[in-house]
Amino acid sequence: MFSALCAAAMVTSVSAQGGKDMLSNGIKYLDVPYVAHTLEADGPEELVINCDEVDCTTLVEYVLAETLTPKLADGDISESAFADNLQKIRYRDGKIDGYTSRLHYIADWINNGVRNGFLQDVTGAMSPDTERLSISYMSSHPQLYKQLANSPENVAKMKKIEQSLSGKEIHYLPKAKLPADGLPWIKDGDIIAITTNTPGLDVAHMGIAFYADSKLLLVHASSTDKKVVVSKVPLS
């Protein structure tokens, strides 16, 4: 699966301790069902929390939100604090202002996390390979998105967002430079976003780095397995 998919990867991290927490929090989701489009509710855009059904992006968002939320004295976390962190992760600068305020493109999602101080761009610091974004997929395929299909206004807003992203330079790690046993600067719990060659799109999949038996694997919500799993083969 990953041999075909992983043309290149973008890696982000939280912190040394945060990475350990990301992995342990991610492992708790193993076997949770994979369900797409859980955020596409009717009515005005609002924060959706559904930890019982996840896709590759919402899995990472829920795990990251839990990791960023301090534990209470009893070892649990505050539901309101979790929701606040989730909103900061999922929406541009943490503000809900309609469908297009949600960070649909992962490059935008990463930039938001770096800008707001809860993510670090590891590939930006460690990999010299770069490319310029060319983003247009959502506005070019509005029929695939419930909130775009019958809303020229949302399509126009999305096109402006895509134009603001296009031309920006990103760092990435080519598949040929990613050995099966990983790299010293990719740590357990790092977020790995796998790029795609689909025109107008930046990322096809994402998950959480996990080293096992000296191999770099991924904790991810798999559309093939229909649940959260640890990948059976290395990312290389």
Regions flagged by a language model, labelled:
Residues 181-185, 201:
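Short, surface-exposed secondary-structure edge patches
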Residues 1-17:
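Bacterial Sec-dependent N-terminal signal peptides
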Residues 192-236:
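C-terminal soluble interaction/assembly domains
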Residues 34-168, 187, 193, 211, ...:
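Acidic/His-rich structured neighborhood in mature extracellular/periplasmic domains
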Residues 171-182, 196:
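Short alpha-helix capping/helix-loop boundary micro-motifs
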Residues 19-30, 39, 77:
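Sequence/structural signature of beta-propeller domains
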Residues 1-2, 31-35:
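Short, compositionally biased low-complexity segments
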